[in-house]
Amino acid sequence: MRVTVIGHSCLRVETRAGTILVDPWLFGSCYWRSWWHFPPSTEPTEEMLRPDWVYLTHHHFDHFHYPSMRKLDRSAEILIPRFGVDVMSDEVESLGFEKPRELIHGREIDLGDG
C-alpha cells in the first residue's frame, strides 16, 4: 500500500485492488477564494484524476471540492458516509457519477483483494 498526501485532507491511497482518493481538493481555492493549499498544490496528473474509488468524508467544500470532482473520471465509485439525508448523494449524481455507495458507521466494506 502506498499513501500520498495531496494536500489538506486529500489523500491518494494505492493498493493492489485499486486507488482510493480521499476528500479530493486537488487544486485551486475553496470557500470563495479565501482558502488555498499550503504549500501550493500542483496541477493534478492524469493518473490522479482516474481513481477507482473516491471517499468523501463530509460535505464541506474543502472535502467535497466541486471543481476537483468535475475533473475526475466518472467511472470512479463514490463512497460517502450515511448521514440520513440525501444532499451528498444528490450532488454526486448531479456531477454525472453513479449513485454513491453509502457507508454505515462501524461497518466494513469490501473493495476487492488489496
Specify the residue positions occupied by each region the protein language model found.
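Pre-active-site segment of Zn-dependent metallo-hydrolases
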Residues: R16-Y55, Y66-K71
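Metal-dependent catalytic neighborhoods of phosphoester/phosphodiester hydrolases
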Residues: H65-S75, D90-E93
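Beta-strand-turn-beta hairpins that frame and shape the catalytic cleft
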Residues: M1-R2, E14-I20, E108-G114
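A short helix->loop->beta-strand "cap" motif at the edges of active sites that frequently abuts
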Residues: G18, R74-E77, F97-E98
